[in-house]
Amino acid sequence: ADGQCMMIVEQGKIVEVCAEPGEFTYDSSTEPSIFTGKLGEGLKKTFATFGKRFTYGGDTGKDQRVYYFNTKELIDNKFGTANPFLFHVADHNTGLSREVQVRCNGIYSYRITDPILFYKNVCGNVEMTYDREEIDGQLKTEFISALQPAFAQLSKLELLPSDIPAHAGDLEEAMNEALTKKWAEKRGISVVSVAMNPITLKEEDL
């Protein structure tokens, strides 16, 4: 179905991946196949690294499992900075250059963009279900930690703190860049959107 990826695993090894809607017939006698759907060519590269077909003289392996991954956008992830962090305000036209302390909060969404990486590095051989609640706390902590380096990228655009909520696209790009190693390259997860409330400054920075 749309927004879903199926994965067949034998003896802990990925042997088939299908992210396209429609009927799928598994044939253990053929070479491994991968149908990426909307997940793109990057999934094929990951499969080439981790996927492997096991053969047992034509017999099914001792442990065969089918997993279904939700690849839809996962929304309503609230975040907020408990402590302020530094943001550099600059304007080369006026010569302005100062550090201010900011706090922010809002909502972000993410989605699984590489189910193979998510399986290998997050959920493994889970027996029943793996719910988002099991990882959302960790993702939230990492998301908040990535805000400061992402804001540092936005400061290069010479934005005022009050301008940032209106630059959601730039912020989403900066967050994905800051989270590349922990999210995209390790877990196969990407930020989809960030909606931010007005940013607050410490009183002495107003």
Residue map of PLM features:
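N-terminal hydrophobic membrane-entry segments
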Residues: 1-205
